[in-house]
A protein has these predicted regions:
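Generic structural signal for small/hydrophobic residues in well-ordered secondary structure
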Residues: 7, 14, 30, 54, ...
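Mid-to-C-terminal secondary-structure elements
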Residues: 92-105, 118-244, 442, 446-624
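N-terminal Sec/SRP start-transfer signal
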Residues: 1-3, 300, 365-393
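Membrane-helix entry/capping segments
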Residues: 21, 207-258, 276-277, 291-292, ...
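Hydrophobic alpha-helical transmembrane segments of multi-pass inner-membrane transport and secretion
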Residues: 1-13, 245-280, 308, 383-406, ...
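Membrane-proximal extracellular/periplasmic loop immediately following the first transmembrane helix
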Residues: 7-74, 184-194, 205-207, 229-237, ...
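Intracellular coupling helices
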Residues: 263-306, 366-377, 649-690, 748-757
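Small-residue-rich transmembrane alpha-helices
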Residues: 6-9, 213-214, 268, 303-366, ...
Length: 758
């Protein structure tokens, strides 16, 4: 019951995402739909002026706001040098018009309208000394050394089911207007609008198009083969519409339903087992005038008490295991219980009570009055076997599901993404003095156990921003690529990324492209004689030559993760240490040795004292990127173990009842020469026959649900029959072992004891 309650609450929590704001149904996200040379795609970000344009040009838009990220680091220091942790974004002065919350101190319009000022959340303000005390204090992010941010006000934290849960909102005035007020390019902003009451967002498309025509060169874009339009999407449904979230909710819902079902089945099974013992009680009650209503009332009182006790125990378990359950859920357990959770849980408890009361009551009400004066022989064996059949099927289904999820998770964290990372560690030097990087690299290379040291704009696991490709002499943009930006010359050699043609760039006029780049370019130009030496142009690279020469073609490697893979072609540029923007320092070790990492961290701390920088094993970061998959695996595994235990208890009760019912039959068999092994085989074979049918049906269901689990991975394990066979053997083994252990007493009993009453 405890795990089921948490799972139901988790589902309600996810479904209530971004429904926590006042009139949340009127909040929409501005999205971009664009097409390049017939290839259509969607994007969740826009240029800086677009949100302001919606407010100015689109009737029915009450307010509009935008935000963007400015730093990766969450490490801040206050005036006393204390280290604080917080997530910071840049937001404009209309932020709280779209996302209202209680303002505890300061004027948000003034704070978010003044450069270098910020609004902070209550939880962050309390770490600065208190809500009122925080106002006026200065904080500094480690990636922006010397840039002092003044706290201008404090707002109440947004709840955990909000996608806008940030600690620090830095004013948009702190950012260059060339970025915040442009209509094309630099589409780094997430933009949101709040509509007037009664406005149908689907009817705003003509006004949105008119806004674009007034402010964007749409005709020129179309001539270049690019189509661009904006549309509104309800914010409240965005989170649950994501494929990985949707699949997770389906899996958690199935597990919660099966756990509740198997618990109820076990309750009914025990109620049926008790019928023989309680038949005289029911018969006597009927003799004294108890009707069907009285029997139903009695069973409902008993069920109410049992459900109440189970809820109390469940609450105590949740309280005791709140840290473990919070880790599985990804948020504090208390945060899961949003208002809708209580309503849904009340409905679930009511359904549990109805089934737990009415099914046994129906069976007990049919006990004849004669049972009060003679032995009641009805044993409901078919009922018991049917309930056990379902329990075994549920357990098999969950064991199969655990195996599928565990194998896919293992594949993900031991992935072969097209580059070598097993002995790789990295550190993010963003915000440090780039002129010191070259000396640091040389010092790191001298450490015993270090094989190589290189620098890069980013690591492949973090994904990639994009830019557009066009040919010299033409303004027609051909396609969008994943721009991996700069890296030092030895980077690809260190990562084991192989060149199929040419080499790594050696100056700012050269660029290396992926094999996927050639595939896309083949749609627009004839490069059949080779890509090396061909010339292209790219947007977003003012530091490079206007015309770039392709110097090499490298094999495609995965950018992102298996669950969020960037399938675009990619490019890579050259830069010198200390000149190009390359904040990521990558070190390849001869073997992943914590002692060597400690030496590297010491050198890093000496180079940048007080920054708290350190190296992270690449493989550890990869594991963290798949933390949601790990949590799903662990959740299903917990449900599987609990269901197996419940099924074992039910099976034990059934074997005990059958041993009593068939004691004389067993005694006669033993008198006629049957051995203990044959008696055990008798009980085991009966359950094996039932189990085989249940297992086959469970395997079929697990195959389809397992396929659903794998659907959002770029690379999947194959659903081999051996996965299901191994799961089947586990369940059969548990069934046979349980039956064997609980049949030992009857198989070894003295037949005289069972026959002496005859």
């Amino acid at each position: 019951m405890a795990i089921s309650i948490v799972l139901v609450a988790k589902i309600c929590f996810e479904l209530s995402y971004d429904r926590c704001y006042e009139d949340s149904e009127r909040i929409f996200k501005i999205k971009t739909a664009y097409s390049q040379q017939g290839h259509a795609s969607e994007f969740g970000q826009v240029s800086g002026a677009v949100a302001l344009g919606f407010k100015q040009y689109v009737p029915g838009v009450k307010s509009a706001t935008r935000m963007t990220f400015i730093v990766d680091s969450e490490r801040f220091t206050d005036e006393q040098g204390n280290i604080l942790s917080g997530k910071m974004i840049i937001a404009d002065s209309s932020w709280f018009d779209v996302f209202p919350t209680r303002i505890l101190a300061g004027d948000p319009k003034s704070a978010l309208g003044t450069s270098a000022r910020a609004m902070v959340a209550r939880s962050f303000a309390e770490r600065l000394g208190g809500v009122q005390e925080a106002v006026g204090q200065l904080i500094e992010n480690e990636e922006l050394p010397g840039y002092k941010i003044t706290v201008g006000g404090v707002f109440e934290d947004f709840p955990h089911q909000s996608s806008q849960r940030y600690d620090i909102l830095l004013s948009m005035e702190s950012y260059p207007r060339s970025s915040t007020e442009n209509w094309l390019g630099n589409d780094r902003y997430r933009a949101y609008v709040r509509l007037e009451d009664g406005i149908d967002y689907k009817m705003l498309d003509p006004a949105i198009r008119l806004m674009q025509e007034k402010n964007q060169p749409l005709d020129e874009l179309e001539k270049a083969g690019t189509e661009l339009r904006y549309y509104l999407a309800p914010l409240a449904g965005e989170h649950s519409a994501e494929s990985n979230v949707r699949n997770m909710l389906i899996i958690l819902g199935i597990v919660a339903l099966l756990m509740l079902a198997i618990s109820l089945l076990n309750y009914v099974l025990y109620a049926i087992s008790a019928m023989v013992k309680r038949s005289k009680e029911v018969g006597v009650r009927k003799c004294y005038g108890a009707g069907t209503g009285s029997i139903y009332s009695m069973m409902m009182r008993e069920a109410a008490l049992d459900v109440l006790l189970s809820l109390v125990v469940a609450a105590l378990l949740i309280l005791a295991l709140r840290s473990v359950l919070g880790e599985l859920a990804g948020v504090p357990v208390g945060a899961l219980f949003v208002p809708v959770s209580y309503a849904v849980l009340a409905l679930v408890v009511a359904l549990v009570f109805i089934v737990a009361a009415l099914v046994p009551a129906r069976l007990y009400s049919r006990i004849p009055i004669a049972s009060a004066i003679r032995n009641y022989k009805e044993n409901k064996r078919i009922w018991k076997l049917a309930l056990l059949f379902v329990q075994i099927a549920v357990c098999t289904f969950l064991v199969c599901l655990v195996e599928v999820i565990a194998l896919q998770y293992d594949k993900a964290i031991n992935d072969k993404p097209g580059y070598e990372y097993e002995q790789l560690a990295y550190a993010n030097l963003r915000g440090t003095d780039a002129s010191t990087h070259a000396a640091l690299v040389e010092r790191l290379r001298s450490v015993p156990g270090v094989e190589d040291v290189q620098m890069s704009y980013d690591i492949p696991l973090h994904g990639s921003s994009g830019n557009n490709v066009y040919l010299p002499g033409s303004e027609r943009e051909l396609f969008n690529i994943a721009d991996q930006y700069e890296g030092t010359p030895g980077l690809f050699d260190m990562l084991g990324i192989r060149f199929t043609d040419g080499r790594y760039p050696q100056n700012l006029e050269e660029v290396a492209v992926s094999t996927g780049f050639l595939t896309r370019m083949a749609e627009f130009a004839d490069w059949s004689d080779g890509a090396v030496g061909k010339q292209i142009c790219l947007t977003g690279h003012p530091e490079c030559s206007d015309i770039l020469t392709v110097c090499g073609v490298y094999e495609d490697y995965r950018i992102g993760t298996l669950t969020d893979s960037d399938s675009r072609a990619s490019v890579k540029f050259y830069a010198e240490i200390g000149v190009g923007f390359m904040p990521f320092l990558l070190v390849k070790l001869e073997r992943m040795d914590r002692e060597v990492l400690g030496q590297l961290n010491t050198l890093l701390d000496e180079a940048f004292p007080g920054r708290g920088l350190g190296f992270t094993a690449y493989k550890d970061t990869m594991r963290e990127f798949y933390s949601n998959e790990r949590k799903i695996r662990n959740t299903v595994m917990c449900g599987c173990v609990v269901c197996l235990l419940i099924a074992i208890f039910g099976l034990m009760g059934y074997v005990r009842d059958e041993s009593e019912r068939r004691s004389k039959e067993v005694a006669v068999r033993k008198v006629n020469g049957a051995t203990s092994r044959e008696i055990l085989g008798l009980f085991i074979w009966e359950m094996v026959r039932i189990s085989l049918v249940a297992i086959v049906l469970a395997d079929i269901g697990a195959y389809f649900v397992g396929g659903l689990c794998l659907s959002y991975f770029a690379e999947k394990i194959s659903l081999s029959p051996w996965i299901f066979i191994s799961a089947d053997l586990v369940v059969l083994g548990v069934v046979c072992a349980t039956v064997a252990v609980n049949s030992l007493r009857i198989s070894r009993s003295n037949p005289v004891e069972s026959l002496k009453t005859e």
